[in-house]
């Protein structure tokens, strides 16, 4: 009971819920309906109000001007009431166009009568009249129809009146009062000026009508056609101003009209239809007005963008030819676009930088374009930076080479490392073209002439030779470039003072070029700076900056430690060059205060040679003037020339060599003496650091005076003499070469005599150095662990003395250049000093200054040659002490004092003696080698050396070391290890021959590929390939393709000197997994071979050539095949012989005869034949005959006609080469008299290659059953004569006999080809006869001609006469044409051909049996019926029904073997049996066959057939008629085999037919 009540309650609640849901839905519907109704009424009221406003604004037409105005008004008033009746049948040209609508039923107007008329020239006057209508919709529709009809009128000259009426109808609606001139014509110039100035009032409320928006839209759709019609017809020239005014008025309209006007202007500029005056006075000012009115206003950015694009097209389309007007009026406003906040505006403006540079020259490019390009390449929007990359090369082409190096090159490298993948991708695409701009033929020896690379000897630059002019700037005259050097007023540049700075920089560049003209240093005399010195210059600058910040505030030391940890940590370190590490230090120093007084003070080195009193007197002034830090004075990390260090030479020598040292010095601290005033300003930490670098302490004035007459030390060449722009006071200089003497019998001679002053100075310096180091260790005590083992304590004192001597022992030798270096070492067992030497007693070699890596002074060396150094940052002393201040201090754990047998003192910090605590020492502590013998040390042993692995990771290997590293890798891992895992570094690229190209650009290019395996795995690689297109393998792949495409340009720019580095990139590109990359290399390998020469081509390019030849991709193989000759000609003779042996490997697979599988590779066979024709000139006739003749004859029988035709040319070339080489011997051996023989006399057994080759041709082509081969032989003969490979006598000897036989061939195509060959032979003989006559007297007679030529001409003429009567009409026509008996312009007479075809038909169908009527046959001969053959119908059995065929299928197959014959159904009565009554012989006329035929029958096949027919006729006469005669089966149907009753039923069909014959005749 309770459950039922609960269920009832639930049911009621559910019904109640449904009711409320329904009610809510109903209420919602009412609300929405009411709202929609209100909105609809509101929208309708707004629409009606707008309609009324638009109608009130439209002007009324009061008077109509023109000849057709009266007619127009009359025609407009015709009945418009038929509009309701027309309904949907109204004529509409365009689906979007609608005819004028009726406002309401009460306000109906008459419809124009042309509304349902065709749109042609007959109704055009009525339509023009309707354009004057007061009704806006009618006028708009009429305007559209009028313009549509005008475009269909052709030619325009016949409809000039209609065009004039149309232009007047448009002109009358111009919304302003026309200003008339004295001749009562519109003064358009005055109207244009007032319209531009805004003083011309546009009427919108007057009675004069105006052009509506729809009319303007229709006009702009047809504006190109209207301008073209006006320009092509002089009668319409006066209306060009009308159209121009419409364009200008549209620029002042609403946004939609403006957009259409801009589009129309772009179309007209593209077609060059706008007048120059109109462009200057109307279009350009109007476009700038639209652009500037939208800045900061409520205007669509799309409209502004279209306006900017139109302005850029003014430059790109060269629409204005006045350069000065553009420079003064266009450029200032254009510069405002470059700082527009809209990204798209800046992008569009960037695109025309290249056009502006070509237009205004080099000076303008450097003053205006380069600053803007650099600024926009740093834009916050990546799309703008991407466009900057795209036009970077175009701008660089217009700039000077110095601007490219100093300004553009660093910024381009920054774009290569852009964080956005698209920017980096585009930059790497442009990297190759940008590098190619630095090409210098005088250095590389490669020059472009007419698009071809020409190799010439490099020219050493003479002192008077200035910097080479850029080829891209050759179009700029000097006067034109100077005209646009000064920017016009109101031109915006990125910074206020940037222009002055940039002009100053350009001035300094000009001064540099002037200095280069006067310098006496040539490229050949410039030496490569030492790599260790360059590294130390950069590291010293970075340490200098860190010291300044470290002294200023202690928290900055953590950042120094962080940078140092980044350099040393193996997990964070990447195998980049040391320059990248120094860049990080430079970034750190940029954040510090540039005016820090705690940095290295700057002093003038000119005062370093003065006396002590002068130094002390000027000390205060120099401190005040040079209190700024070194970072503020140095422009880069390598520029330390502001730090004054003393030279150890006399003032006179310094003055004499001032000009030389300004160009050739380097900033290495080794061997340089620090100025006294500078030394006094250094703290103890900086002093210790400089002393460890090999710098000498300040000297006393007395010592200066003593050695004032000493010669100046050797100066080191500068790093880049081409980049030095001004003379600078240098920081460091090299000391003289050091010579170490051994303590032998001449001990007294090698030890220099030390004066008392020198010994006192020595002692003072030792004391000073000891105090300084002790103070330094005390100050840095908390940072270093001074606990030591007992073993280290015992040797600390002696080691400390040794370390002190390492800094001060060479002080005196720096002053005397020619004095030998004596190193005094105090032995542990004796107190005497001994002199040691690194040379043998018999030969004493001086120690050269040109070390491969000079981190330290020459007083340091590795303790053992076998003791290799660990990689950079792997030392435990540095890893365990992250608080270490520099990487250099961490490297002391592997160094020691030269020839010191014990460990160093505790002054090295954390781990005490570095020798005992070094990780390598601990590993080899049990078997530590003894110190090397001093007498066996070479000069290179006295320097600090790094192992090859460490130098690879630092990127400082030279060429020899890199080659050694490659060879070692190849010996372990093979060739793949060399090409995949070798690090491509370019530190050594800074040679004298490669200083014309910025190193960073080339290094970036070489690091694109990186390890092949690294790019795919995504980790482990460290080249630029891992940073470009991160996360997008497709972009990486595309970058590799561009790298391969630009490789020839880079190779051309760098020359042969850079090939040891480019070789690795080349191999990786050739082994790339992408077919397109390999394809680019295969298509350009011949150009690379041209640049590199024979030796490099043989060693490096030839293996790659073989690999690409066997590539699986056909496009790659095709690139190798196309340039086969171009590559082989750059090989040495030995390699050429190897190449010709591999020619069969180029033979395509589908070329073998009988291979029908691959017929699509015929283009490869075609290209192979053309290349072999060129290769004949590179080889001897024996090689050509042995290796190329077989390929030529094989491809001469190819299936493709193009291949055969090209093979014929190769055969002709080979024949010519062989005959030319052996003809003289053949004439003597074969006894050829008078240059002619009829039969070859080969009694002599001497074999000639030419005769053997010709015999092969004759036997393979002329005497064969295949007619295509015989035809090819005729082509070979004709080609030999065309190419003049043989003269008339030679051709008569080799080819005349088989050619005469083929002239009577049974195939018409062969006779036709032989006719062409005979024609060429005849022309050759006639030319030879004319030449003989010119050589004789003018009155020579035909009898005096050589008998051989005259007889050959007669022979050929007789053969041509026979061919002129040939049965084939084509062969006959060619023969007559060759004899001059017919003309090409005369029609061909086909009557004879028709007669011959009828004769052939009658001969073929002369006597056959045809079906005459149902049940009988007829024998027909021509048109006459010879005999009727009747058939007995009783003997014919009916065929089985079709539906029962399946039932008897098995029985048919079972009795197939026993069946004698199969009867035909009664409806099939056919006979195609040829019979012969008489003894007439009918041969198969093979002359009529115009296709390939089988010729396997014997010569007596025709006689056998005749005998068979005669035997059959004789047997048929003896056979009697039987009841069951059979028909001749034609297409027998399968039926049941009848029972065989007698032997007569199994008689042959011919017998049956013969019996019928007998019956009929009886």
Swiss-Prot record:
Residues 1531-1540 have a biased composition (Pro residues). HEAT repeats lie at residues 330-366, 369-406, 408-446, 1062-1100, 1101-1139, 1295-1333. Residues 98-110, 761-775, 1501-1523 have a biased composition (Basic and acidic residues). The keyword Coiled coil applies. It is found in: Cytoplasm. Residues 838-847, 907-937, 1541-1562 have a biased composition (Polar residues). Residues 605-627, 708-724, 819-837 have a biased composition (Low complexity). Residues 1479-1528 form a coiled coil. GO terms for cellular component: cytoplasm. One of its GO terms (molecular function) is protein domain specific binding. The keyword Coiled coil applies. InterPro entries: ARM-like, ARM-type_fold, HEAT_type_2, PP2A_Regulatory_Subunit_A. GO terms for biological process: embryo development ending in birth or egg hatching; establishment of mitotic spindle orientation; negative regulation of meiotic spindle elongation; polar body extrusion after meiotic divisions; regulation of mitotic spindle elongation. It comes from the Eukaryota. Residues 98-120, 588-672, 695-726, 741-847, 905-943, 1480-1562 are annotated as: Disordered. Keywords: Coiled coil, Cytoplasm, Meiosis, Repeat. Disruption phenotype: Embryonic lethal in 10 percent of animals and slight increase in the number of males produced. In oocytes, slight increase in metaphase and anaphase meiotic spindle length, persistence of microtubules around chromatids during anaphase and delay in spindle assembly in meiosis II. However, localization of spindle pole marker aspm-1 and the shape of the meiotic spindle are normal. The second polar body has a larger size and in 16 percent of animals its extrusion fails resulting in aneuploidy. The size of the polar body is further increased in a mei-1 (or646) mutant background. Its main location: cytoplasm. Serine/threonine-protein phosphatase 4 (PP4) occurs in different assemblies of the catalytic and one or more regulatory subunits. The catalytic subunit is likely to be pph-4.1. Interacts (via C-terminus) with mel-26 (probably via MATH domain); the interaction targets ppfr-1 for ubiquitin-mediated proteolysis. This is Serine/threonine-protein phosphatase 4 regulatory subunit 1. It comes from Caenorhabditis elegans. The lineage of its organism: Eukaryota, Metazoa, Ecdysozoa, Nematoda, Chromadorea.
């Amino acid at each position: 009971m309770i459950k039922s009540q609960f269920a009832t309650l639930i049911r009621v609640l559910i019904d109640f819920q449904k009711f409320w849901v329904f009610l809510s839905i109903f209420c919602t519907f009412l609300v929405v309906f009411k709202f929609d109704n209100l909105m609809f009424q509101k929208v309708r009221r707004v629409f009606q109000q707008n309609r009324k406003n638009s109608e009130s604004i439209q002007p009324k037409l009061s008077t109509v001007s023109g000849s057709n105005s009266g007619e127009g008004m009359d025609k407009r008033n015709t009945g418009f009431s038929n509009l309701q009746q027309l309904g949907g049948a109204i004529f509409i040209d365009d689906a979007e166009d609608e005819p004028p609508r009726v406002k309401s039923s009460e306000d109906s107007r008459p419809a124009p009568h042309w509304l349902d008329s065709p749109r042609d020239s007959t109704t055009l006057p009525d339509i023009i009249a309707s354009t004057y209508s007061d009704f806006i919709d009618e006028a708009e529709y009429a305007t559209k129809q009028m313009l549509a009809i005008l475009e269909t009128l052709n030619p325009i000259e016949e409809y000039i009146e209609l065009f004039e009426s149309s232009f007047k109808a448009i002109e009358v609606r111009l919304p302003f009062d026309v200003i008339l001139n004295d001749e009562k014509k519109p003064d358009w110039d005055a109207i244009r000026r007032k319209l531009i100035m805004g003083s011309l009032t546009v009427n919108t409320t007057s009675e004069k009508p105006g052009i509506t928006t729809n009319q303007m839209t229709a006009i702009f759709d047809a504006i190109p056609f209207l301008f073209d019609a006006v320009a092509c017809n002089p009668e319409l020239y006066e209306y060009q101003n009308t159209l121009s005014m419409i364009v200008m008025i549209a620029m002042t309209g609403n946004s939609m009209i403006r957009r259409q006007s801009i589009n129309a202007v772009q179309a007209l500029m593209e077609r060059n239809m706008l007048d120059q005056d109109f462009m200057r006075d109307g279009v350009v000012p109007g476009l700038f007005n639209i652009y500037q009115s939208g800045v900061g206003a409520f205007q669509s950015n799309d409209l502004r963008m279209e306006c900017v694009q139109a302005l850029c097209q003014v430059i790109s389309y060269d629409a204005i030819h006045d350069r000065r007007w553009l420079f003064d009026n266009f450029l200032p406003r254009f510069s405002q676009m470059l700082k527009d906040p809209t990204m798209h505006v800046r992008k569009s403006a960037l695109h025309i930088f290249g056009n502006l540079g070509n237009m205004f020259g080099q000076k303008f490019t450097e003053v205006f374009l380069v600053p803007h390009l650099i600024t926009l390449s740093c834009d916050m929007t990546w799309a703008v930076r991407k466009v900057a990359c795209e036009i970077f090369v175009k701008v660089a082409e217009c700039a000077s080479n110095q601007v490219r190096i100093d300004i553009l090159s660093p910024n381009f490298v920054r774009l290569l490392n852009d964080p956005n993948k698209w920017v980096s991708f585009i930059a790497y695409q442009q990297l190759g073209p940008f590098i190619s701009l630095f090409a210098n033929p005088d250095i590389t020896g490669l020059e472009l002439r007419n698009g071809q690379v020409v190799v010439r000897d490099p020219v050493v630059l003479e002192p008077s030779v200035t910097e080479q002019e850029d080829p891209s700037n050759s179009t700029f005259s000097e006067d034109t470039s100077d005209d646009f050097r000064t920017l016009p007023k109101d031109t915006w540049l990125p910074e206020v003072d940037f222009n002055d700075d940039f002009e100053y920089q350009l001035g300094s560049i000009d001064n540099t070029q002037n200095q280069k003209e006067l310098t006496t240093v040539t490229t050949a005399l410039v030496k490569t700076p030492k790599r260790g010195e360059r590294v130390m210059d950069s590291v010293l600058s970075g340490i200098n900056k860190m010291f300044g910040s470290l002294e200023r505030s202690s928290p900055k030391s953590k950042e120094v430690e962080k940078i140092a940890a980044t350099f040393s940590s193996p997990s964070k370190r990447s195998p980049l060059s040391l320059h990248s590490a120094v860049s990080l230090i430079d970034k750190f120093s940029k954040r510090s205060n540039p005016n820090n007084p705690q940095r290295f003070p700057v002093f003038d080195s000119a005062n370093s040679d003065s006396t002590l009193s002068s130094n002390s007197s000027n000390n205060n002034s120099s401190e005040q003037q040079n209190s700024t830090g070194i970072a503020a004075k140095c422009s880069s990390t390598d520029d330390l020339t502001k730090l004054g260090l003393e030279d150890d030479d006399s003032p006179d020598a310094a003055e004499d060599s001032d000009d030389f040292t300004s160009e050739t010095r380097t900033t290495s601290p080794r061997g340089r003496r620090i100025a006294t005033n500078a030394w006094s300003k250094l703290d103890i930490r900086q002093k210790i650091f400089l002393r460890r670098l090999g710098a000498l302490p300040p000297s006393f004035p007395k010592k200066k005076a003593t050695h004032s007459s000493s010669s100046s030390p050797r100066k080191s060449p500068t790093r880049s003499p081409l980049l030095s722009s001004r003379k600078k006071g240098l920081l460091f200089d090299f000391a003289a070469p050091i010579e170490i003497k051994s303590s032998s019998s001449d001990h007294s001679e090698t030890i220099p005599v030390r004066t008392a002053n020198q010994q006192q100075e020595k002692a003072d310096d030792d004391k000073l150095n000891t105090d300084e180091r002790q103070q330094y260790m005390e100050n840095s005590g908390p940072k270093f662990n001074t606990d030591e083992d007992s073993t280290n304590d015992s040797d600390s004192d002696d080691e400390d003395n040794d370390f002190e001597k390492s800094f001060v022992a060479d002080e005196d030798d720096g002053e005397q250049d020619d004095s030998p270096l004596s190193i005094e070492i105090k032995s542990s067992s004796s107190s005497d000093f001994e002199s040691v030497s690194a040379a043998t007693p018999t030969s004493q070699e001086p120690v050269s200054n040109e070390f491969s890596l000079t981190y330290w002074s020459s007083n340091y060396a590795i303790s053992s040659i076998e003791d290799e150094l660990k990689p950079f940052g792997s030392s435990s002393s540095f890893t365990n002490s992250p608080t270490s201040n520099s990487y250099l201090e961490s490297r002391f754990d592997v160094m020691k004092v030269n020839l010191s047998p014990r460990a160093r003192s505790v002054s090295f910090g954390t781990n005490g003696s570095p020798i005992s605590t070094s990780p390598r020492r601990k590993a080899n502590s049990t078997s530590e080698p003894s110190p090397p013998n001093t007498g066996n040390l070479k000069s290179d042993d006295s320097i600090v050396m790094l192992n090859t692995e460490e130098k690879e990771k630092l990127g400082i290997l030279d060429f020899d070391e890199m080659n050694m590293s490659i060879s070692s890798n190849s010996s372990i891992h093979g060739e793949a290890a060399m090409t995949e895992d070798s690090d491509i570094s370019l530190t050594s690229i800074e040679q004298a021959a490669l200083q014309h190209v910025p190193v960073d650009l080339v290094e970036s290019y070489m690091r694109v590929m990186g390890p092949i395996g690294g790019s795919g795995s995504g980790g482990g690689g460290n080249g630029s390939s891992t940073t470009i297109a991160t996360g997008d393998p497709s972009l990486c792949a595309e970058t590799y393709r561009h790298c391969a495409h630009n490789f020839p340009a880079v190779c051309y720019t760098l020359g042969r000197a850079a090939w040891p580095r480019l070789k690795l990139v080349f191999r990786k590109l050739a082994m790339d997994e992408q077919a397109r990359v390999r394809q680019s290399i295969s298509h350009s390998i011949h150009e690379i071979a041209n640049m590199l020469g024979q030796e490099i081509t043989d060693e490096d390019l030839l293996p790659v050539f073989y690999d690409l030849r066997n590539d699986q991709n056909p496009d790659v193989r095709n690139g190798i095949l196309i340039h086969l000759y171009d590559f082989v000609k750059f090989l040495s003779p030995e390699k050429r012989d190897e190449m010709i042996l591999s020619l069969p490997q180029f033979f395509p697979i589908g070329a073998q005869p009988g291979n029908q599988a691959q017929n699509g590779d015929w283009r490869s066979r075609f290209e192979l034949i053309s290349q072999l024709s060129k290769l004949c000139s590179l080889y001897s006739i024996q090689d050509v005959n042995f290796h190329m003749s077989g390929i030529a004859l094989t491809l001469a029988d190819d299936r493709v006609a193009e291949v055969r035709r090209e093979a014929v040319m190769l055969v002709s070339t080979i024949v010519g080469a062989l005959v030319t080489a052996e003809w003289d011997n053949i004439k003597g051996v074969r006894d050829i008299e008078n240059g002619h023989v009829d039969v070859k006399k080969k009694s002599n057994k001497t074999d000639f290659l030419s005769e053997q080759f010709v015999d092969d041709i004759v036997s393979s082509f002329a005497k064969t059953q295949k007619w295509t081969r015989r035809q090819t032989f005729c082509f070979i003969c004709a080609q030999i004569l065309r190419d003049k490979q043989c003269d008339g006598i030679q051709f008569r000897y080799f080819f005349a006999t088989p050619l005469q036989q083929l002239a009577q061939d049974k195939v018409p195509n062969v006779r036709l080809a032989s006719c062409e060959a005979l024609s060429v032979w005849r022309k050759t003989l006639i030319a030879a006869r004319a030449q003989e006559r010119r050589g004789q007297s003018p009155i020579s007679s035909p009898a005096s001609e050589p008998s051989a030529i005259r007889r050959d001409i007669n022979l050929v003429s007789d053969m041509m006469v026979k061919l002129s009567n040939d049965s084939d009409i084509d062969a006959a026509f060619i023969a007559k044409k060759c004899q001059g008996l017919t003309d090409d312009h005369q029609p061909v007479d086909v009557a004879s051909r028709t007669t011959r075809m009828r004769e052939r038909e009658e001969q073929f169908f002369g006597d056959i049996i045809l079906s005459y009527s149902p049940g009988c046959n007829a024998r027909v001969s021509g048109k006459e019926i010879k005999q009727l053959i009747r058939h007995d119908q009783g003997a014919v059995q009916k065929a089985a029904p079709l539906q029962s065929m399946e039932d008897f299928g098995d029985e048919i197959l079972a009795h197939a073997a026993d069946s004698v014959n199969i009867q035909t159904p009664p409806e099939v009565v056919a006979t195609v049996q040829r019979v012969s009554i008489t003894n007439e012989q009918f041969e198969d006329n093979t002359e009529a066959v115009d296709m390939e035929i089988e010729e396997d029958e014997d010569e007596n096949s025709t006689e056998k057939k005749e005998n068979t027919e005669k035997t059959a006729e004789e047997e048929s006469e003896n056979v009697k008629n039987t009841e069951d005669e059979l028909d001749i089966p034609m297409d027998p149907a399968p039926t049941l085999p009848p029972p065989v009753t007698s032997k007569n039923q199994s008689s042959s069909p011919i017998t049956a037919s013969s019996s019928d014959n007998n019956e009929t005749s009886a």
